[in-house]
């Protein structure tokens, strides 16, 4: 397979095993769902009546006071009492093996390639850390919502992109399915393509 490099106007060979696979929707859905679930904190917790601090003594006698009967100050119907079905901390980790994860990334890259959402460049940098310079460069390329994958990330590029919520810069080793499907276009440097091919083969 070959793609045209935007800045040098030369054709770049890319692996068909990574950028020319059939789109496996069910696998991508499974991996994306697993990735999102794993990111959940699961730290929400409440106290049940057995965990609330308080006396175990009956507040008043059963009969003769005129008030409703009560057996504990820790009852869920009392103020400051325990919660009936108290939430507990949970581990939301959902395991996906490496082969499935790699195949999902290959499938996503292939679909992006088919939809002409991948742009190849020799290098991508800005002269200063000013956001307006990066925005101007992207406007010249007719880009707004973009993921930039580069082998060597320029400090100016990182600093200038931080203020743009629709622009994300990352190393090839840090790519994940959420990033790949979240942006309309993906800019990849030639050096980064080689690393991606090494990682996914």
From Swiss-Prot:
Q: Which GO terms describe its molecular function?
A: rRNA binding; structural constituent of ribosome
Q: Where is the signal peptide?
A: none
Annotated keywords: Ribonucleoprotein, Ribosomal protein, RNA-binding, rRNA-binding
Q: Name one GO cellular component term.
A: ribosome
Ranges for region Disordered: 39-72
Its organism's taxonomic lineage begins at: Bacteria, Pseudomonadati, Pseudomonadota, Gammaproteobacteria, Enterobacterales
Of which family is this protein a member? Answer: Belongs to the universal ribosomal protein uL4 family.
Please give the InterPro entries that the UniProt record associates with this protein: Ribosomal_uL4, Ribosomal_uL4-like, Ribosomal_uL4_dom_sf
In the UniProt record, the gene name given for this protein reads: rplD
Instruction: Check the record and name the Pfam families matching this protein.
Output: Ribosomal_L4
Keyword Hydrolase appears in the UniProt entry:
no
GO BP term, pick one: translation
Name of the protein in question: Large ribosomal subunit protein uL4
Assembly and partners are described as: Part of the 50S ribosomal subunit.
Task of the protein: One of the primary rRNA binding proteins, this protein initially binds near the 5'-end of the 23S rRNA. It is important during the early stages of 50S assembly. It makes multiple contacts with different domains of the 23S rRNA in the assembled 50S subunit and ribosome. Forms part of the polypeptide exit tunnel.
Gene3D superfamilies per UniProt: 3.40.1370.10
């Amino acid at each position: 397979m070959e793609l045209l490099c935007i800045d040098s106007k030369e054709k770049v060979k890319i692996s068909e095993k990574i950028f020319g696979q059939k789109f496996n929707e069910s696998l991508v859905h499974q991996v994306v769902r697993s990735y999102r679930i794993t990111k959940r904190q699961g730290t929400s917790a409440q106290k049940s009546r057995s965990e609330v601090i308080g006396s175990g003594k009956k507040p008043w006698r059963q009969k003769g006071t005129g008030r409703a009967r009560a057996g504990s100050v820790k009852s869920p119907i009392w103020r400051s009492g325990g919660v009936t079905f108290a939430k507990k901390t949970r581990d939301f980790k959902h395991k996906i093996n490496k082969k499935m994860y790699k195949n999902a990334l290959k499938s996503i890259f292939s679909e992006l390639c088919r939809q002409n959402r991948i742009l190849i460049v020799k290098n991508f940098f800005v002269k200063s850390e000013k956001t307006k310079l990066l925005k101007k460069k992207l406007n010249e390329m007719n880009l707004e919502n973009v993921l930039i994958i580069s082998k060597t990330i320029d400090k100016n590029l990182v600093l200038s992109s931080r203020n743009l919520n629709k622009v994300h810069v990352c190393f090839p080793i840090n790519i994940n399915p959420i990033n790949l499907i979240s942006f309309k276009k993906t800019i990849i440097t030639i050096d980064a393509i080689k690393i991606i091919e090494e990682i996914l083969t």
